[in-house]
Amino acid sequence: GSGKTTMMKMINQLIEPTDGNIYLNKKRIKDHHQRELRLETGYVLQQIALFPNLTVAENIALIPEMKGWKKEQIQEQTKVLLEKVGLSFEDYAHRYPKELSGGEQQRVGIVRAIIATPKILLMDEPFSALDAISRKQLQDLTKQLHQEFKMTTLFVTHDTDEAVKLADRIAVLKDGEIVQVDTP
């Protein structure tokens, strides 16, 4: 209701702002080439968006393949990142999403979002549908990965405790307007 998801859609050019501008690296979003902007943006959504007909490894490989990475490079980076999120390559690479728990699917979604080292990571209430234990584990993991990869992350949540735990800066939205920005 406050405009969080709409803001995310404007950042990746799914919809255009009706008023004002959004800037990324001092350049208006609408002046960025749409395909390049989207290839440089990682996404982790509340509704885990893995392709059911693709294996874990195939889901993760999508963006690197579009960027022209070599197969060996994709496989090596997939191994490294799956291990970082607590999933062994040997046990998970050839599984399908339906064979994973919700928390495991979201871990795969995080790997898919960061494998190509995007400039910006958009996370739209990614943990709200998970149980409390998985949620805490993934919050801790997100914080660790953010510190390691140093990518700009826009994390949308309605949970103020989660915002305080994960954010360097917090923006509060009301009726589509930013009403406050501060550090936690």
Task: Give residue spans per PLM region.
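Conserved ABC ATPase signature
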Residues: R95-L100, E104
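Conserved catalytic motifs of ABC-family nucleotide-binding domains
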Residues: T117
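ABC ATPase "signature
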Residues: V181-D182
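Conserved ABC ATPase "signature" region
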Residues: E65, E72-D91, Q144
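Catalytic Walker B motif of ABC-type/P-loop ATPase nucleotide-binding domains
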Residues: L121-D124
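Helix-to-loop junction immediately C-terminal to a conserved catalytic motif
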Residues: N12
